[in-house]
Amino acid sequence: MKKYLLLLALCFTFAALFAQPTNTNISNGVLFDGEPYLAMNPSNNQNLVTAWMGMKFSNGLFRIAIKTRASFDGGNTWSTVNTLPHFGLGYGSADPNMAFDANGYLYLSYIDYKQNPDSGGIYVARSGDGGLNWDTPSKAFDMYDVANKRPIDRPWLVVDKSSTANAGTLYITTKPAPWIAPPNRPYYKVSSDSGHTWTAIANIDGTGYLTGNSITAPMAAPVTTIDGKFCAIYPSYVASQNILPCYYFASSTNQGQSFNYNLMYATVPAGADTNLKSGYQLIAHPSDANKLYFVGPVSQNQDADIKALNSTDGGQTWSGPVRVNDDPLGNGKSQDMVWAAYNEQGHIATVWRDRRNDAATGFWNIGYDFYYAVSDDNGQTFSTNQQMSSQFIPFDSIVAENGNDFLSAVYSGDTLYTVWGDTRNGKLNIWFAKTIASTNTTVDVNILNESNDLFNLFPNPAGRQLQINFKEDVVSLPIEIFNMKGQVVYNLIVSERQNSIDVSQWQSGIYLIKIDGKVQRFVVD
C-alpha cells in the first residue's frame, strides 16, 4: 500500500485498476494525428515506442510529419515528442512502421514525398537508445524505382530476430501509390547492413502465383519467423491460377532470393463499404516457427466482421476463417481497423474498431468503440470480446479520410498495449490503453510533464555527476530520487542554486527526481 500511495502521489505509474477502461491522449495534436504504430523492445519489455502521423507547421506550411515517443516503464510515462525530418520542400510524411531487432536496436520506416511533380521515397531511421533519439534516415525506396508505378505506399518493415544466418536482416514490402492504376504488384527490398543499403527492388509474387491485372493496391503483409524465414501474404486474382480471388503465402529461406508459394485462402468476394479500413496483418509465433496467424475484416453476412486464419505447419496449409467479434451475426454492425500480437507464451490478442454499440447500421454517422479478444490456441477460438475504449466515440467524417487506416498493439505476459486514432475530443488524436487482458482492467497513465520552472538537470544521460541547477534561490529544499520501482534511492536537502550528485556508482537506468512537487526524469548510463 505504501508503494501504491507513493506512485499515485508522483503521478507517473499506476493510479488504480478500474472496471471502466481508461485511455490516455498520447499525441495531443491540434488537428490531425493518424495511423499510429507501437513497438516493444524484445530485450526490455518495459521499453515501448510509438510513432504516428502528426500535423506540423514548418517553413510556412502545414505538413504531416512522423512523431515518436518512448517509454521505459511499460507505458506509464512517455518521453517528449521527437519529429522525423522531411527531405524536400513541401514534402509530407506517412505510414510509420517500426521493428526492434533481437538486441534492442530499433528501426523506423516512413514515406516522405510530394505529388506534382512526384518525388520522394521510403526512408529508414535507426535508434540505439530505445527510441529517444534517431540517426539521419537513409533512403530505402525511391519514387521511381519502378517506372510509372511509384512504389512507396504502405511500407511494412520487419527484422529477422532468429539465431540463424539471416539474423538482423531487414525487409520492407511496399506497393504502388494510391493514384496508380493496375496492373500493380507487391514489392520488397532487403538490407543486411542495418538499412543503410538495400537490394534492387523486386516483386514478391511469382509465376503461377501472380497478383494479376485487376488489383489496385496489392498490399503484402510481411513477417519473419524464428527459424529465419521471410514470409508475406498478398492478394491475387488470376482465373488461370484460381477461379476465385485469393491470398497467397510466400516464404523465403534465403533473404528473398527465391520464394515458395502456398494458397492461403480463396473465396467468392462480397460487396464491402469502401469507407471501411480493410487492412490485414500476418504475425508469427515468437518461439514456434510452424505457427502463424492472419487477420483482417471480411465483408460477408451483410456487414464486415473480423476473421482470422491460422497455420500450424509453417504456412503450408491454413484453417478456415474464424469469426473473432462476438456480436450477433448479420446485424449490420461493421468491424474494421484490426491488429494482432502474440505474447511470449504464444497467446494472441486481436484488437479492432467496433460499431456494435450504435443503434443504427452502416458506416456514415455511426459511432464506434475499440474492442479486443484473446486466443490461447493460435486463433482457433477466442475469448469473450471486451471493450477497450473508455467511451463511445461519435462519428466524425475525418474517419473516412486517408491517414487513419491502422491501429497497433503489442502484448506481453497478460498486458495488452494499444494505440489508435479517434475523434472523441473533436479532432483526430492518438490514444493509448494499457490493459490487463485477462480481467479487462486498465491502468491509468499520466504523461509526465518534464518541463518545469524550478530547476534544470544536466547532463542527461549522466555518467559521473548529475548537476541540479535552480533558477532561483532556495532554502532547505528537500530532494528525493526514485528508481522505476517507486523506491527512494537518494535524498538530500539543498540550499544552493548549483548542486552536484555523484552517480558514478549508481546502477544504469531511469530515475525520477522530485523537488517541491516537480518531477523530472533522468538517465544514468
Q: What do these predicted ranges mean?
A:
Residues 20-441:
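Extracellular, repeat-based ectodomains that mediate carbohydrate processing or recognition
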Residues 442-446:
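Intrinsically disordered, low-complexity regulatory segments in eukaryotic proteins
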Residues 4-6, 11, 15, 447-525:
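C-terminal outer-membrane/trafficking sorting elements
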